[in-house]
Amino acid sequence: MHLKGKSPMNYIGRFAPSPSGPLHFGSLIAALGSYFQAKAQQGTWLVRIEDLDPPREMPGAAAHILRTLEAYRLHWDGTVVYQSQRHALYQDQIDAWLSTGQAYYCQCTRKAIKAMGGFYNGHCKIHPPARQQDCSIRLRMDNQVQQFIDLKHGTITIPKALAEEDFIIKRRDGLFAYNLAVVLDDIDQGVTQVVRGADLIEPTGRQISLYHTLKQKPVSYLHLPLAMDGNGNKLSKQNHAPAIDPTAPRQTISHAMQFLGFTLPTDFSDASAEQMLAWGCQHWQVSQLPEAIEITPRFSNGPA
């Protein structure tokens, strides 16, 4: 399989939402953070729809997300990529690994793995299943990553058992695993840095190990603070976070920029959405980012 790779000279970032619902305040934070980080470096900002899991998708959500980004004047570069149209890329890589023994079939259930202590112990690597039906596919973890550097959080240490685990790259239901798809897509699109929410810190080690297995240079990572509700839960579609209002971008952008640590000018109330974003690109600094912040309805779904 041929992957395009990336040029070291040009910054390429991306925003990659899943279409399981409309954009909410937490996903706007990820969009703005990745946008500011790219544009502050005169870089490219891509949008990719991560529609890998049809049972979790909401009909029409992908189009709604793109319309909302446009309403917020977050204009992406290039063409929107849909993971649902890239299955051949993922399967070709899996087939290549299966042919060399780098990947293998596994029939272990969640119940069986729980009995192993919660981490898969390599059972099917030693005892291959007699049949391939109803099996997942795992990658041999020959390139373990136990630490990585995050631009905000510094050195992140990954538990040894997690770092050593042969992880799933294709599920037993036939769906491709998130870790495999995002790494292959980021390599193919030339992404140089991933900016996303801190809830995705955990799989980062596995994704870096995939870069090493593919003999590619890993991207750098910046994990943004999470927007939390009053109960300490992350704002997410699963937690029924309200959709942001596409008809009132200025107020919500202002609130989101304050969340990201900006001290806004006193005359910002008269600025257009385009002017606010341009100002943000000029003044963005990673050092301004706060820790997780509680979000009230005033931030996520209310008037200015």
Swiss-Prot record:
Q: What are the record keywords, sorted?
A: Aminoacyl-tRNA synthetase, ATP-binding, Ligase, Metal-binding, Nucleotide-binding, Zinc
Residues that coordinate or bind L-glutamate: R14, F15, A16, P17, S18, E50, Y178, R196
Family per UniProt? Belongs to the class-I aminoacyl-tRNA synthetase family. GluQ subfamily.
Offer one example of a GO biological process linked to this entry. glutamyl-tRNA aminoacylation
Q: Where is this motif: 'KMSKS' region?
A: 234-238
Q: According to its UniProt entry, what is the function of this protein?
A: Catalyzes the tRNA-independent activation of glutamate in presence of ATP and the subsequent transfer of glutamate onto a tRNA(Asp). Glutamate is transferred on the 2-amino-5-(4,5-dihydroxy-2-cyclopenten-1-yl) moiety of the queuosine in the wobble position of the QUC anticodon.
Query: Motif 'HIGH' region at which residues?
Result: 17-27
Q: How is the cofactor bound?
A: Binds 1 zinc ion per subunit.
Mind telling me which GO cellular component terms the entry cites?
cytosol
Q: According to the UniProt record, what class of enzyme is this?
A: ligase
Species in which this protein is naturally found:
Vibrio cholerae serotype O1 (strain ATCC 39315 / El Tor Inaba N16961)
- Where on this chain does ATP bind? K237
| ATP-binding keyword on record | yes
State which Enzyme Commission number(s) the record gives: 6.1.1.-
HAMAP family in the cross-refs: Glu_Q_tRNA_synth (MF_01428)
Instruction: Read off the lineage from the record.
Output: Bacteria, Pseudomonadati, Pseudomonadota, Gammaproteobacteria, Vibrionales
Give the source's domain of life in one word: Bacteria
Q: What is this protein called?
A: Glutamyl-Q tRNA(Asp) synthetase
Can you provide one Gene Ontology molecular function annotated for this UniProt record?
zinc ion binding
What gene is it encoded by?
A: gluQ
Asked whether the keyword DNA-binding is assigned, the reply is: no
Q: Which InterPro entries match?
A: Glu-Q_tRNA(Asp)_Synthase (IPR022380), Glu/Gln-tRNA-synth (IPR000924), Glu/Gln-tRNA-synth_Ib_cat-dom (IPR020058), GluQ/Sye (IPR049940), Rossmann-like_a/b/a_fold (IPR014729)
What Pfam families would the database entry show? tRNA-synt_1c
Q: Where does Zn(2+) bind?
A: C106, C108, Y120, C124
